[in-house]
Amino acid sequence: MSQTIDLTLDGLSCGHCVKRVKESLEQRPDVELADVTVTEAHVTGTASADALIETIKQAGYGATLSHPKAKPLTESSIPSEALAAVPHELPVATADEESQQLLLSGMSCASCVTRVQHALQSVPGVTQARVNLAERTALVMGSASAADLVQAVEKAGYGAEAIEDDIKRRERQQETAIATMKRFRWQAIVALAVGIPVMVWGMIGDNMMVTGDNRSLWLAIGLITLAVMVFAGGHFYRNAWKSLLNGTATMDTLVALGTGVAWLYSMSVNLWPQWFPMEARHLYYEASAMIIGLINLGHMLEARARQRSSKALEKLLDLTPPTARVVTEDGEKSVPLADVQPGMLLRLTTGDRVPVDGEITQGEAWLDEAMLTGEPIPQQKGEGDSVHAGTVVQDGSILFRASAVGSHTTLSRIIRMVRQAQSSKPEIGQLADKISAVFVPVVVAIALFSAAIWYFFGPAPQIVYTLVIATTVLIIACPCALGLATPMSIISGVGRAAEFGVLVRDADALQRASTLDTLVFDKTGTLTEGKPQVVAVKTFNGVDEAQALRLAAALEQGSSHPLAHAILEKAGDDKLPQVNGFRTLRGLGVSGEAEGHQLLLGNQALLNEQHVATDDMTAEITAQASQGSTPVLLAIDGKAAALLAVRDPLRSDSIAALERLHNAGYRLVMLTGDNPTTANAIAKEAGIDEVIAGVLPDGKADAIKRLQSQGRQVAMVGDGINDAPALAQADVGIAMGGGSDVAIETAAITLMRHSLMGVADALAISRATLRNMKQNLLGAFIYNSIGIPVAAGILWPFTGTLLNPVVAGAAMALSSITVVSNANRLLRFKPKA
């Protein structure tokens, strides 16, 4: 018997999260219908609550059983026409309390990431945990306490620290990174200072074979090497031991095994040479020291490169000034930023950085918003305009009232989105995760198998060849490069996008954006300025223009439609009559009664439905529509009275931006509620390939579905509340800056500047990021696929040579450095204009 189960959801942050959960539930044979929002799910079918919760967890989110109480429907609870298009299926901003970021230490490779992630996800209350090897951080969603999270990480054998304040956390992260680089540097110097002279001496003078004459000298070198292994390489052995206790294996395990076996063999030969044949008395002390030195050197260079990749987020954090100038009855005073509260009056002068969001109450100024929006040209701001934290006053002086402070400012929201995106993992990275989970055990197995083959079938002295093969295979294998390949590209790509005013919700959005072939644009406010103007008024049946404007404006007083503002503005300051019986006719227009007249105002379909003859207007309707204007028709007492031609001009950069997108190979589609004639005229001017006209607000998502059913990968670009369902339905939703909060929260990508050039920039950066990610993954796979067989001696039958363990150590270090350096190229990426 079917039942409906109500679940409370955790960890969903956008329309695609909703879509993913819905699809996961509806794939179950025992689920008939799943109604999913960002906070809850109502599932009808025969499945049990536990089974549904498990399905949602497998999709990467959290769920608990809920028992909501029914609420009586009142008139005020009925949604408005504008909101009816997006009833309850849209996400809201995730509150700060729902996520915590931890600083991690002790991680060295992708296997460590898997271990820490499992430890965090096992903590009660955690709905999602994202561990980032490149940043050495973990972003944890859910209600678990910081103490529980830190304890779980420490129990897994790693270090963790929870710091709430973004700036303090970043400072701590920088301190740790600098200290780590210094530590790796001196460890590398110490190890190489011992390893290089011994290796050179062996190549030039002594042949590294122990004899009765040099036995004591080699014993001293062995003890010095042991000291190097303890002080310069101790972290490898400590971490390997912790991993062993936790039943896992990491890169440190490979290094510890390789260098440890080489040293133990050498010391055994040194102490008991009589146990070994003469040709097997070769010593490998220099290999242990050199390997530790080279890998530490690689870690130092890698840490330095990783620090460069985090500069974008550091720049955003540095935008907030430490103090603000507050204006009170007693005058002006400088106060710490933490003391500023909403409603306070603040002053800004030339050169000041805006401390919080607010609205200008007095004065004018030019503000540089480049770091926030990517817009290089300073913007003039005056009374009533908004200012945002992080922007800079280039010239002028203003008073403004604080409206959002602390974590509620636009800048804080951007930092939060960038941080979450940098911690996310795309679908392509999941392959690397699966391989990383079994990488180290497989490498150890390959090393043992290869050593066995050389021991039983190799040339004499077998024990020497066995040792070299096992050590080289263990050392050359590099899970570190595999673990860094995806997160380094994401950190650099998301950071670079932020510098262009492009905010990416998660790494999946970047991956999806790189595969798009069709871009759908909402017309009003996206392709156009969103500020329509009445460009012509034509009257009929003896009605004069002033009367037509006055009555039309009176009706539009009750409408929130963008065209209504244009008509009200055209009417000016004239006193407007009172309207009775006002009604909004969805998709048609409005109606009402004023000054004893029955009024209709809307499109031609409205007048036709009300049996108002429009024959006299037909020629003018066609003429205005063909010029790109929207004809708004007025009928008085059942007769056609006037035509108001309203035109919303294209944005200044729309044509250039669309041409740029055309050249990049995208098919461009315009989605609008306008009549086909008007829509086609605008599309022709803008260079649009395809027009979908006459679409009602709640039909936009269906239009996107139809395009997707044709096999297209679709992005929707919009800015209004009624665009939100389409933004969620599209493969990638792109919200224009300055748009509604609902649209921005639904979109996968948000443009901070209201310019279509941002769309081209966003798509170019997404393609570059995915290309970089593939290069890193391919490089890591090729390195290991070639390096491990070569280390195992596959070239011996053809060349008669084996790879030296020292060369293997250098190659391992170089592989990680190469991945990080390649990802850092994204920090210099510039989209082609």
UniProtKB/Swiss-Prot annotation:
Keywords: ATP-binding, Cell inner membrane, Cell membrane, Copper, Copper transport, Cytoplasm, Ion transport, Magnesium, Membrane, Metal-binding, Nucleotide-binding, Phosphoprotein, Repeat, Translocase, Transmembrane, Transmembrane helix, Transport. The active site is at 522 (4-aspartylphosphate intermediate). One of its GO terms (molecular function) is ATP hydrolysis activity. The keyword Magnesium applies. The keyword Magnesium applies. Cu(+) 2 binds at residues 109, 112. One of its GO terms (biological process) is copper ion homeostasis. It comes from the Bacteria. Cu(+) 1 binds at residues 14, 17. Its EC number is 7.2.2.8. It is an enzyme of class 7 (translocase). InterPro entries: ATPase_P-typ_cyto_dom_N, ATPase_P-typ_P_site, ATPase_P-typ_TM_dom_sf, ATPase_P-typ_transduc_dom_A_sf, HAD-like_sf, HAD_sf, Heavy-metal-associated_CS, HMA_dom. Signal peptide: none annotated. It holds the Pfam family E1-E2_ATPase. One of its GO terms (cellular component) is plasma membrane. SUPFAM superfamilies: Calcium ATPase, transduction domain A, Calcium ATPase, transmembrane domain M, HAD-like, HMA, heavy metal-associated domain. Residues 3-64, 98-161 form the HMA domain. It catalyses: Cu(+)(in) + ATP + H2O = Cu(+)(out) + ADP + phosphate + H(+). Mg(2+) binds at residues 719, 723. The chain crosses the membrane at residues 186-206, 217-237, 253-273, 283-303, 437-457, 463-483, 778-798, 800-820. Belongs to the cation transport ATPase (P-type) (TC 3.A.3) family. Type IB subfamily. This is Copper-exporting P-type ATPase. It comes from Salmonella typhi.
